[in-house]
Amino acid sequence: MLILLPMSPEIASYNSIQSPSDKIICDKLLQKMDAVLTNAVSKIWHAHPVWFIDDNPIAGYSKQKAGIRLMFWSGASFDEVNLNIIGKKFKDASIIYKSPEDIDLLDLERWLQKSIEIQCDYKNIVKRKGRLDRLK
């Protein structure tokens, strides 16, 4: 049984417009992200739920053709085999969930902890003309 913690109305609205299976995935991600990222602020950013620490994006999810994509802005530095690194310029990494059963809660919690401990400075990337520095 899925027990939901209090959530932002905007993220609840985002989750509610997903297909039934995708909504379950989104709700599971939201519950775990809110439970682990207690010092983060969550909001809809560029039309998707994103969690921030000190105005720096660290994690979020979005609907893609392939499923629900969970992304970590500094995930390329996590050294995790199940996270896919697509680009070279930025330090993001992600995983696609096609069904609620795909979510490994132990992996998810570990990745969320790493998103707190390992952060690149996306907040100031424009000021630094595209250079991405590590904060933590």
Show the residue positions of the predicted features:
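Charge-dense, helix-prone N-terminal extensions
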Residues: 1-136
